């Protein structure tokens, strides 16, 4: 029992330090349905996103016509295996990192009426990189 309390305390400390690190880097951590995610990654925040990418196993990268530019408004939806939306948010830039639990997830992105989606299995310590390349207007 005592060992469990020590482990729980260390985990709480780690989570607090992780959030503090992101805040110190100027990244706001969002949370929906118990899932943490960060948005943006353009301009000055790109370097900060690279520093915390290991904490988020799902990396959504948004391009337009194959170019890494500010994509403008992009709506991201993360759906569970039942098809229920667990996260719905604006990308806020070319990167959208998500920390869902293991399972089958569908990530959808919508920009100017164009919809893209990808379903993947997230297991163990695996990282998923999901590239969404939208058409140029």
Enumerate the language-model features and the residues they cover.
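A short tyrosine-centered beta-strand micro-motif
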Residues: 103-109
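Short amphipathic beta-strand segments in non-cytosolic proteins
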Residues: 75-86
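N-terminal signal peptide c-region/cleavage motif recognized by signal peptidases
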Residues: 13-17
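Surface-exposed loops/turns
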Residues: 101-102, 124
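Short beta-strand segments within Ig-like beta-sandwich modules, predominantly Fibronectin type-III
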Residues: 86-91, 120-122
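Short, surface-exposed beta-strand/beta-hairpin micro-motifs centered on an aromatic residue
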Residues: 93-99
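Primarily secretory-pathway and cell-envelope proteins
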Residues: 20-74, 112-137
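Bacterial N-terminal signal peptides that target proteins for export
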Residues: 1-6
């Amino acid at each position: 029992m005592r060992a469990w309390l020590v482990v729980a305390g260390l985990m709480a400390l780690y989570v607090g330090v992780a959030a503090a690190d992101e805040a110190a880097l100027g990244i706001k951590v969002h949370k929906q349905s118990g899932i943490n995610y960060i948005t943006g990654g353009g301009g000055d925040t790109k370097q900060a996103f690279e520093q915390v990418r290991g904490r988020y196993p799902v990396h959504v990268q948004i391009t337009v016509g194959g170019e890494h530019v500010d994509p403008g408004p992009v709506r991201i939806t993360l759906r569970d295996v039942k098809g229920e939306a667990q996260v719905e948010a604006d990308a806020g830039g070319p990167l959208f990192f998500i920390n869902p639990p293991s399972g089958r997830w569908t990530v959808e992105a919508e920009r100017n009426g164009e919809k893209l989606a990808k379903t993947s299995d997230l297991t163990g310590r695996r990282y998923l990189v999901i590239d969404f390349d939208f058409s140029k207007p």
